From Swiss-Prot:
Top-tier EC class: transferase
InterPro entries (UniProt xref): Aminoglycoside_PTrfase, Kinase-like_dom_sf, Pseudomonas-type_ThrB
Name of the protein in question: Hydroxylysine kinase
Main subcellular location of this protein, as a coarse class: cytoplasm
Function: Catalyzes the GTP-dependent phosphorylation of 5-hydroxy-L-lysine.
Family the UniProt entry places it in: Belongs to the aminoglycoside phosphotransferase family.
Cellular compartments per GO CC: cytoplasm
Keywords of the record: Cytoplasm, Kinase, Transferase
Source species: Mus musculus
Reaction(s) the record says it catalyses: (5R)-5-hydroxy-L-lysine + GTP = (5R)-5-phosphooxy-L-lysine + GDP + H(+)
SUPFAM superfamilies per record: Protein kinase-like (PK-like)
Length: 376
């Protein structure tokens, strides 16, 4: 959902390419003739869905792509963007439903271009990925079993990334990256975006508790590379038939690796729980199913489990505070930026009203019920 830590300068950093400029980029950088192009929603970069015109000779090459233009802040770290591309290719080779990376005419995975897109000449990183079919899970009714599978997928992804090796892997140590859960205290700089209200009081309490109860235990968490943004718009599903002939939604795509950084297993499961709660009609129940799926691959330790409730609240706080702050920068993008806020504040309040003990009881009992099913 984000791609940089330099939020203070982001007001002038977001690309504002016209469709004609984007089409010209596709042709000049990648050598494709565009038949149709349409903008896609984005937090602080610019994305276009691109249809490629094919000649009379038919090929098996894809005809739909996503052109991704990074903001000027992120464009200053080309090695990090290139690393994300390498991860996408690695995971695809390992069998995960990620996009394919399109190479430029110069046989690179990214290109740095300088252009005036309306606010003076600036440099932007450009890349293109294959367009993945499917609908965001935010748009479909998700069953308990599917929540379990999503939790399992998140753990499998983190597990697979243990085998990813690259000389620049240290780039994922993004110390001041606002979207890394470890950096919840950095939210204090953005609290001015919230009016004095119960919402603000809850976030202030979350930050205080995070410093006292999570920061002191980080050394006890197991480290890994996190996707960091497995939200309900970054997981795509397609309808397929089950063995019984019923239509079921299967994961068909994993999107947006822009928030990848070193974190911890428990961070990933907390992030997934939080985002799967957003559109749920019974949000408090979600955590147990996600946790059961995740723990079928990577069981959490007692210390990690104890931190889970506060980490879910912390991710809600990150998302809600930064959405409010971003709306001040990009009021024209308010509808997209406030997706989480439509239900997020209500869910965060409910978590706090119920309290950690009551919520954990629901989550852990639900997760335990899967263990008994498996052992039968």
């Amino acid at each position: 959902m984000s791609s940089g830590a330099g939020w203070q300068s982001q007001a002038s950093a977001k690309p504002v390419f016209t469709e004609a400029q984007a089409s010209a980029l596709v042709e000049s950088v990648f050598g494709f003739k565009v038949s149709k192009i349409q903008p896609l929603p984005s937090y602080e970069d610019q994305n276009f869905r691109v249809h490629i015109a094919r000649g009379k000779e038919t090929t098996d090459d894809p005809v739909e792509y996503v052109l991704k233009i990074s903001n000027t802040e992120s464009s200053q770290t080309p090695e990090l963007i290139e690393m994300q591309n390498h991860v996408i290719m690695f995971l695809r080779a390992a069998g995960f439903p990620t996009a394919s990376v399109c190479r430029t005419k110069g046989d690179n995975t990214i290109s740095l271009i300088s252009i005036d897109s309306g606010s003076g000449v600036k440099s932007y990183l450009v890349r293109m990925l294959t367009y993945l079919p499917g609908r965001p899970i935010a748009e479909v009714a998700i069953s308990h079993q599917q929540l379990y599978e999503i939790g399992r997928l998140a753990a499998q992804l983190d597990k697979a990334l243990e085998e990813f090796h690259h000389p620049k892997l240290s780039l994922f140590h993004r110390e001041n990256f606002i979207w890394n859960l470890k950096n919840v205290p950095l939210l204090e700089k953005y609290m001015g975006a919230l009016s004095q209200s119960r919402n603000r009081e809850i976030v202030e309490q979350v930050i205080r508790m995070f410093k006292e109860e999570v920061m002191t235990k980080l050394s006890h968490f197991r480290e890994c590379i996190n996707h960091g943004d497995l939200n309900d718009h970054n997981i795509l599903v397609d309808l397929s038939k089950s063995a019984s002939g019923e239509g079921v939604h299967q994961v068909s795509g994993i999107l947006d690796f822009g928030d990848m950084s070193y974190g911890y297993y428990v961070f990933e499961v907390a992030i997934v729980i939080m985002y799967m709660m957003i559109e749920s009609t019974n949000p408090i129940q979600v955590g147990g199913h996600i946790l059961a799926g995740f723990e079928s691959v990577i069981p959490l330790t007692a210390v990690e489990r104890q931190a889970l409730f506060l980490l879910v609240c912390s991710r809600f706080s990150q998302s809600l505070v930064m959405a409010a702050y971003s709306c001040q920068l990009y009021p024209e993008n308010k509808e997209y930026l406030m997706i989480t806020a439509k239900t997020g504040w209500k869910h965060l309040q409910q978590l706090f009203d119920m309290g950690q003990k009551a919520v954990e009881e629901i989550w852990f009992e639900t997760a335990k019920s899967y263990e008994s099913e498996i052992s039968m």
